[in-house]
Amino acid sequence: MIDNNCLYKEELNRNSYSGLAKEASESILLPSESGFDGSRSPVCSSPDPNLNYRPVIGILSHPGDGASGRLTNDTSSTYIAASYVKFAEAGGARVIPLIYNEPEEVLFQKLELVNGVIFTGGWAKKYDYFEIVKKIFTKALERNDAGEHFPVYGICLGFELMSIIISQNRDILERFDAEDNASSLQFVDNVNNDGTLFQRFPPELLKKLSTDCLVMQKHKYGITPANFQANPALSSFFEILTTCIDENSKTYVSTVKAKRYPITGFQWHPEKNAFEWGSSAIPHSEDAIQVTQHAASYLVSEARKSLNRPESQKVLSNLIYNYKPTYCGYAGRGYDEVYIFTQPRSRF
């Protein structure tokens, strides 16, 4: 016996499918039916003339070989950890190495080729290195004061040196126990993230930054919020965005943004999550990688606002591509790759 209810349901299903198919066919148009001329290329919007789509970041080298002398005994050698180069490239920029001990005339000619600067991590706080950082930092302020948008990232040692320069106090730093651990970031109450590197972070990632260990700490020194605020020069120049707590539950300033300049200071390492593997403490989760990516994108988005567009050939002749990185990760600690500079190869 035929079940009339089943026949009715089958007919209803056929009619529903037919209706959906008809609706789909009416909404999907072939190129010839849409008025689009397939023989012509689509019209793209014009680039913003106020942005530089070929930004170059200068990264200052640091004394040594980056591997405690395992790679070279040349006392004049300097290095840049490749993770900083990859960090800038991940944001969409090219890199020119600023070799700190080459003739100042050459160094500052190179500085005229870039749209922003990174002061890296390391240990050198005195003598020639400090003086070069101070001169480059002063130049960066002058360029911004003259109307050019010129961003600076000071990471770990870079932030420490900027703090010493601004405060004019070498004793502003104190010891902390944060030499090899991941941590969260504690955002200052009522802080405004507009115009900071955190502005483009998705809300969920910002929330995780304050609860999960997504940033890498690798430093012995820092500044307490109290000492920071007690120094008029420092507190008027920078705004504190985040703090961190070290292994002894001692609080230090971890992220700052200059109030009048596109300058950001980190007492953590945004570059390590994606590009360093020597320490098991470095976070490599998807969220941690996004932290690196957003920090890199912010730096380069600021560099695009620089309208400094030097002669192309001079840029090409001084790019990091003219050098080869050295793999030094066999020891299972420290950097994975470094660029070592023993003889300047600048071309002007």
Curated annotation (Swiss-Prot):
Any one GO molecular function term: gamma-glutamyl-peptidase activity
Keywords: Cell wall, Hydrolase, Secreted, Signal, Vacuole
Pfam families registered for this protein in UniProt: Peptidase_C26
Active site: residue positions: 156 (nucleophile), 269
Record-linked InterPro entries: Class_I_gatase-like, Pept_C26_g-glut_hydrolase, Peptidase_C26
SUPFAM superfamilies (alphabetical): Class I glutamine amidotransferase-like (SSF52317)
Effect of a null allele: No visible phenotype under normal growth conditions.
GO biological process per UniProt: tetrahydrofolylpolyglutamate metabolic process
Domain Gamma-glutamyl hydrolase per the UniProt entry, residue ranges: 46-342
Enzyme Commission code: 3.4.19.9
Transmembrane parts of this sequence: none
Cell compartments where the protein resides: Vacuole; Secreted, Extracellular space; Secreted, Cell wall
Highest taxon above the source species: Eukaryota
Main location: other
Annotated signal peptide: 1-23
Known tissue expression: Highly expressed in roots and at lower levels in leaves, stems and siliques.
One Gene Ontology cellular component annotation held by this UniProt entry: vacuole
Its biological purpose: Cleaves the polyglutamate sidechains of folate polyglutamates in the vacuole. Is important for polyglutamyl tail length determination before vacuolar exit. Plays a role in folate stability and intracellular folate content.
Protein family membership: Belongs to the peptidase C26 family.
Name of protein: Gamma-glutamyl hydrolase 1
Species this protein is from: Arabidopsis thaliana (Mouse-ear cress)
Species classification: Eukaryota, Viridiplantae, Streptophyta, Embryophyta, Tracheophyta
Gene giving rise to this polypeptide: GGH1
